[in-house]
């Protein structure tokens, strides 16, 4: 039997201890310590980060980050005032690329740069497709207190920030059967075999919807269990009684190498698996009594050919969960609430890199968990 360990490094002090709440596994699973050297700090140009909206590791093992410059706390923006009221800081561009060592490689984007397309009011989700293009979306489903419009779109850019495509647009939702507008879409994945973009359209709608990734032409859509999506107001499921026949916050979507499509039904604490045509395959439920943010935030696949494991972000329990992809079995679980290095506060997303390390995003930071023991890719 093994126990997971995490090294918590802070300033010049470090200690190593057992991670609380670990489920011991009978088979080899990856083990992690915190890499407190990532990213390289301070960030250049006196940059400060707002809320982290999405992260993704590309084919070059680079971490891409999407944050909201407009949500950098005002007290941190003294340098950007006219005249300056402090030595720190200015809001960083919305999209930042880091190498595996944590160095900033390039950065671009933000609402002030949006010309000819609709920048999201409340950013959500980042994905890098097989061509290297960057996809971002937004989760706002109604008019904001500041008058900002609902987010009904996903945007596609080249790696250097050139606008390429907008699917949907601003405006209130017309419902889960409308194919012209999204409603608080949370995430996308692009299938290299068909060049189709699969969208988790889940904060306002209750569906997976598929478009051509170059033209934006609508292809198909489905709801829970592969049935037509509906907008019935259903309570969240706690694992008792019959499972609901509708999604409740479709928060992630990932296409595996074998063609299976994994969908996170966040507030119902489950993953549903489909064929690419929407045919239902399987359902996996995790910590069904979890309320709050739910137990199924997002998944990422282990970087071997078989994609042996998935890492599951459990935001409601502040956990990282390692799952065997073949049958959805939970193999290990670690993590704890807190704001110290190595702890989680509003953990929103977790991603494997090409070496099996894990990046976690939460509020205003990204942490890197370095693989040290157990099975490696």
Which residues does each PLM region occupy?
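Bacterial N-terminal signal peptides
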Residues: 7-20
């Amino acid at each position: 039997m093994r126990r997971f360990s995490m090294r918590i490094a802070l300033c010049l002090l470090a200690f190593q201890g057992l991670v609380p709440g670990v489920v011991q596994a009978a088979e080899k699973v990856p083990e992690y310590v915190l890499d407190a050297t990532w990213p390289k700090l301070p960030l250049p140009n006196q940059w400060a980060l707002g809320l982290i909206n999405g992260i993704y590791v590309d084919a070059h093992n680079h971490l891409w980050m999407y944050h909201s410059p407009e949500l950098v706390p005002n007290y941190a923006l003294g340098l950007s005032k006219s005249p300056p009221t402090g030595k720190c800081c200015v809001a960083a561009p919305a999209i930042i690329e880091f190498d595996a060592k944590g160095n900033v490689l390039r950065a671009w984007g933000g609402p002030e740069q949006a010309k000819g397309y609709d920048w999201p009011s409340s950013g959500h989700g980042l994905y890098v497709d097989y061509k290297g293009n960057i996809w971002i979306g937004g989760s706002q489903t109604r008019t904001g207190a500041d008058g900002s419009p609902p987010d009904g779109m996903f945007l596609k850019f080249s790696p250097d920030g050139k606008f390429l495509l907008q699917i949907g647009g601003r405006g209130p939702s017309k419902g889960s059967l409308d194919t012209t507008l999204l409603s608080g879409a949370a995430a996308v994945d692009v299938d290299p075999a068909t060049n189709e973009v699969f969208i988790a359209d889940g904060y306002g709608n209750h569906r997976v919807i598929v478009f051509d990734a170059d033209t934006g032409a609508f292809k198909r859509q489905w709801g829970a269990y592969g049935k037509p999506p509906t907008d019935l107001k259903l309570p969240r499921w706690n694992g008792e009684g019959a499972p609901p026949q509708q999604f409740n916050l479709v928060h992630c979507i990932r296409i595996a190498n074998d063609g299976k499509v994994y969908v996170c039904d966040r507030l119902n604490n489950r993953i549903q698996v489909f064929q690419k045509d929407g045919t239902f395959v399987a359902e996996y439920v995790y910590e069904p009594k979890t309320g709050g943010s739910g137990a199924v935030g997002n998944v990422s696949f282990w970087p071997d050919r078989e994609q042996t494991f998935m890492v599951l972000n459990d935001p409601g329990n502040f956990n990282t969960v390692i799952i065997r992809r073949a049958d959805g079995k939970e193999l290990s679980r670690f993590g704890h609430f807190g704001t110290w290095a190595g702890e989680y506060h509003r953990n929103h997303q977790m991603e494997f890199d090409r070496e099996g390390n894990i990046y976690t995003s939460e509020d205003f930071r990204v942490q890197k968990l370095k693989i040290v023991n157990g099975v490696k890719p």
